[in-house]
């Protein structure tokens, strides 16, 4: 939790939804799975970030991995695009997230997922196309650039927060 007050945590979670993420899937993926199974192969899905990334010494070493130090940061810039368009829907459709069984999700959470995504898409994609007096490709480019900067920034922050020895 960010705040001692559950009221403020709830407000923040709705803001989280408005930037394209889903607080319910985040809670499962991060709080329940990642913090329970930190860096445990087969459970911590953060170790499965991309096929060209070797995040664990237990993964087979492939030739592409010699380039991961070059490919990682540019690829992490794309992470929020994957998150807002694919990841939350995929996680809600799975019967397991990491080591946690999630056979069904409350209807309320499905509604919140779709409403949150609809608000995000409307605010950050649809409305700029309608109201910004610029070519459509400028609006699209601005959206993609903002998502790339957000993904890159989040990657750097989370990488620095998670670099630990022998875990």
Descriptions of predicted regions:
Residues 1-5, 28-32, 91-92, 137-141, ...:
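Juxtamembrane/interface segments at transmembrane-helix termini
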Residues 1-105:
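Membrane-embedded catalytic scaffold of the fatty acid hydroxylase/desaturase
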Residues 18, 69-81, 105-157:
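Alpha-helical bilayer-embedded segments of polytopic membrane proteins, i.e.
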Residues 84, 88, 129-133, 162-167:
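Transmembrane helix-loop junctions in multipass membrane proteins, especially transporters and channels
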């Amino acid at each position: 939790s960010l705040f001692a007050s559950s009221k403020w945590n709830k407000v923040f979670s709705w803001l989280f939804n408005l930037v394209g993420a889903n607080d319910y899937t985040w809670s499962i993926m991060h709080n329940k799975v990642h913090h329970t199974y930190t860096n445990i192969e087969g459970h911590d899905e953060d170790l499965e970030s991309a096929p060209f990334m070797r995040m664990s010494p237990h993964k087979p070493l492939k030739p592409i991995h010699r380039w991961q130090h070059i490919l990682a940061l540019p690829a992490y810039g794309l992470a929020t695009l994957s998150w807002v368009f694919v990841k939350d829907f995929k996680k809600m459709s799975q019967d397991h997230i990491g080591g946690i069984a999630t056979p069904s999700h409350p209807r309320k959470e499905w509604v919140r997922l779709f409403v949150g995504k609809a608000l995000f898409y409307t605010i950050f994609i649809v409305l700029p196309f309608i109201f910004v007096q610029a070519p459509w490709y400028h609006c699209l480019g601005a959206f993609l650039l903002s998502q790339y900067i957000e993904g890159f920034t989040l990657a750097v922050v989370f990488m620095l927060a998670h670099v630990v020895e022998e875990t």
